[in-house]
A protein has these predicted regions:
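N-terminal binding-site loop/beta-alpha segment at the start of enzyme catalytic domains
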Residues: 1-85, 155
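Acidic (Asp/Glu)-rich catalytic clusters
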Residues: 8, 74-81, 121-125, 154, ...
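Conserved beta-strand positions
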Residues: 18, 57, 88, 131-134, ...
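Short, acidic/polar
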Residues: 32-47, 108-124, 170-173
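A short, structured active-site edge motif that brings together acidic residues
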Residues: 82-95, 189-190
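Surface-exposed, active-site-proximal loop segments in enzymatic domains
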Residues: 94-107, 228-232
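Active-site groove signature of glycoside hydrolases
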Residues: 121-140
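Beta/alpha (TIM)-barrel catalytic core signal, keyed to glycine-rich beta->alpha loops juxtaposed to Asp/Glu
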Residues: 137-314
Length: 314
């Protein structure tokens, strides 16, 4: 698989990333059986063997079990640890943490950032995280406090680079003003059924500041690939059907699957979007890599955009 630089760093990552949110098959740690953990390890190995060199996780994915699965994979596969880059995230706290009446919330306090990083390093069984994200915007974020936490992690050798996830441009600009080094990534939801980043300045900022945009849920939870949620009683049935029909037409022109075309559509943008593949199916993981060799024409790209909008361009 081809590679690209992560932001303005010298670090190179694969053009598609592997995300392990679903790797253990549950969000409840008590349900992670040895069989599920083994299946998760096999999924990571399948991605590595298919050419993925950037692996994405988060502290909240099954309360750290997904990070543990990646860590176990690194132990099993000789040379993998040095051949890949590892990203994980902090900042989301679910309801009940730490007290029964504690609400679901976001926490960018220095205390939580530092604690979460140490916990992730333990789960992953590594010494340094290549890319450490703030997961979702904390409206109480104090940039100087975050900067101090980042500096402490950097100085301790625990984190190589920092990024953000689900941040609008204004949040990125505000935080960046207080940091000693540039943010290198912004991971947001991007796919033909969610066009906001194309219009709200997110991708423009990525180009301007040389920030790598990574797309989580690039297939809209899978339905852009399978069409499984295309039901006649859905309020956007006609729009979705037109979109899938258009994608199918382009896929037919290439002799490729709908999934590959959707990924190639994202990768066409000059901001160099990196789609994050979250399948546990080795065949699907391998199939997605075909998008790296597809260069849609401008006409094909715009046909999909117009169908995604559900109305003609002005």
């Amino acid at each position: 698989m081809k590679t690209q630089h992560l932001g303005e760093t010298k670090v190179k990552i694969s053009r598609l990333a592997y995300g392990n949110m679903r790797s253990v098959g549950t969000w409840k740690p008590a349900e992670v059986t040895p069989e599920k953990m083994e299946a998760a390890i096999e999924s990571h190995i399948a991605a590595y063997e298919a050419g993925y060199t950037h692996f994405d996780s988060a502290d909240i994915y099954c309360a750290g079990q997904c990070e543990i699965a990646l860590g176990k994979t690194l132990k099993r596969v000789k040379g993998m640890k040095k051949a890949i880059t590892i990203a994980t995230k902090c900042g989301i706290r679910f309801g009940g943490d730490p007290n029964p009446d504690s609400p679901h919330r976001y926490d960018f306090s220095a205390e939580h950032i530092l604690w979460s990083c140490d916990n992730s390093l333990k789960n992953l069984d590594i010494e340094r995280i290549d890319l450490y994200y703030l997961h979702r915007p904390d409206l109480l974020m104090n940039p100087p406090e975050i900067a101090k936490a980042f500096n402490k992690l950097k100085k301790a050798g625990k984190v190589k680079h920092f990024g953000v996830s689900n941040f609008l441009p204004s949040f990125v600009t505000t935080l960046q003003a207080f940091l000693d080094e540039p943010l290198v990534a912004n991971q947001v939801e991007i796919h033909p059924a969610r066009l906001d980043p194309y219009y709200d300045g997110t991708l423009d900022q990525c180009i301007e500041k040389n920030i790598t945009p990574l797309a989580w849920s690039p297939l809209a939870g899978g339905w852009l690939g399978t069409g499984r949620e295309l039901k006649a009683d859905h309020p956007e049935f006609e729009k979705r059907k037109k979109l899938l029909d258009t994608i199918d037409a382009v896929a037919g022109e290439w002799g490729l699957s709908r999934t590959v075309i959707v990924l190639a559509w994202l990768m066409k943008h000059p901001s160099k979007i990196v789609p994050i593949i979250g399948s546990n199916n080795p065949a699907n993981i391998k199939e997605a890599v075909k998008a790296d060799d597809v260069e849609l024409t401008r006409e094909q790209w715009y046909r999909i955009l117009v169908a995604a909008r559900g109305k003609p361009l002005p």
